[in-house]
Amino acid sequence: MTDSQKEAPKIEFPCDYPLKVIGVAGPDFQEVVATIVRAHAPEFDASSIDALDSRNGKYLSLRFSIQAQSEEHIRRLFLDLKAHSAVQMVL
């Protein structure tokens, strides 16, 4: 089997799953993201968010982890985050 044919590593659920959300900096961006995340992970603690402004202050990067239950759980959260107009990228 070549490197290109190797399967991606399997994630064992439930697990702590790190996320990074980048969006347009605004007074409520962090709270909007926390609200979306809480809809999928009610135990999420918004005080665990690590926020970093871009050099020019236009964007805000939020890093945090959730307790992911399945690949579908992560996929639904990604879709809801990406659907918000202020969110530019979800990693």
UniProtKB/Swiss-Prot annotation:
It comes from the Bacteria. This is UPF0250 protein HCH_05838. One of its GO terms (cellular component) is cytosol. Gene3D superfamilies: 3.30.70.260. It holds the Pfam family DUF493. Belongs to the UPF0250 family. InterPro entries: UPF0250_YbeD-like (IPR007454), YbeD-like_sf (IPR027471). It comes from Hahella chejuensis (strain KCTC 2396).
